[in-house]
């Protein structure tokens, strides 16, 4: 799989299946051709995994030394932690979307004349429109992916959400 950066084996697929069935992780699949029915172009080989319990994830991240844990947690809750926590915020949004009953999808596509890609962190389907969601850990000044997505799929894009640490 793309997650591991190598070809998957039957054992890898079995382990992933066990994790998903245990409900300890959430899978977010790439949709290669986003339409209202996102599942139609679901790429089973391209996915991101999120921990289903963000509180547990936070504890695992910052519980290196018990004496500094409370200080880190206070800084985290007060938005004063000097760290790039994009993965933590993204995990929180994944957990909330899944709890609301949404299947998790994201979308990537190559930037023109580049080896880099645009990525929409989460993509929902609501009625006849797609709803892109971008999660930023710091500056919301740069949001090329959501802007380009809205241009590329203007006929099917509805509301767009750009979430930052100030929103979470």
Where are these regions (language model features)?
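Conserved helicase/translocase motor-coupling segment
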Residues: 1-18
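A cross-kingdom feature that marks ATP-driven nucleic-acid transaction machinery
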Residues: 14-17, 21-168
């Amino acid at each position: 799989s793309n997650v591991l950066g190598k070809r998957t084996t039957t054992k890898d697929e079995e382990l992933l299946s066990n994790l998903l069935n245990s409900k300890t992780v959430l899978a977010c699949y790439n949709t290669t051709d986003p339409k209202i029915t996102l599942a139609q172009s679901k790429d089973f080989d391209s996915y991101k995994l999120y921990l289903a319990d963000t509180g547990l994830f936070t504890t695992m991240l910052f519980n290196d030394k018990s004496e500094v844990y409370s200080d880190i947690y206070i800084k985290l809750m007060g938005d004063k932690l000097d760290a790039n926590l994009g993965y933590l915020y993204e995990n929180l949004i994944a957990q909330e979307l899944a709890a609301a009953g949404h299947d998790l999808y994201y979308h990537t596509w190559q930037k023109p004349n580049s080896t880099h890609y645009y990525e929409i962190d989460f993509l929902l389907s609501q009625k006849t429109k797609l709803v892109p969601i971008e999660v930023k850990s710091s500056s919301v000044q740069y949001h090329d992916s959501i802007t380009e997505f809205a241009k590329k799929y203007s006929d099917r894009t509805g509301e767009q959400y750009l979430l930052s640490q100030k929103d979470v």
